[in-house]
Amino acid sequence: MPIITSYFGFLLTALTIASALFIGLSKIRLI
């Protein structure tokens, strides 16, 4: 169970970073 939790946390962190990068690129492209 701890392995699944840590994997889910890692996935959530990666998704958050990816979305933040995507939003940043979109803002730069809009300007």
Swiss-Prot record:
It is found in: Plastid, Chloroplast thylakoid membrane. GO terms for cellular component: chloroplast thylakoid membrane; cytochrome b6f complex. It holds the Pfam family PetL. The keyword DNA repair does not apply. It is a single-pass membrane protein. Its main location: plastid. One of its GO terms (biological process) is photosynthesis. Keywords: Chloroplast, Electron transport, Membrane, Photosynthesis, Plastid, Thylakoid, Transmembrane, Transmembrane helix, Transport. The chain crosses the membrane at residues 3-23. One of its GO terms (molecular function) is electron transporter, transferring electrons within cytochrome b6/f complex of photosystem II activity. The 4 large subunits of the cytochrome b6-f complex are cytochrome b6, subunit IV (17 kDa polypeptide, PetD), cytochrome f and the Rieske protein, while the 4 small subunits are PetG, PetL, PetM and PetN. The complex functions as a dimer. Component of the cytochrome b6-f complex, which mediates electron transfer between photosystem II (PSII) and photosystem I (PSI), cyclic electron flow around PSI, and state transitions. PetL is important for photoautotrophic growth as well as for electron transfer efficiency and stability of the cytochrome b6-f complex. Belongs to the PetL family. This is Cytochrome b6-f complex subunit 6. The gene is petL.
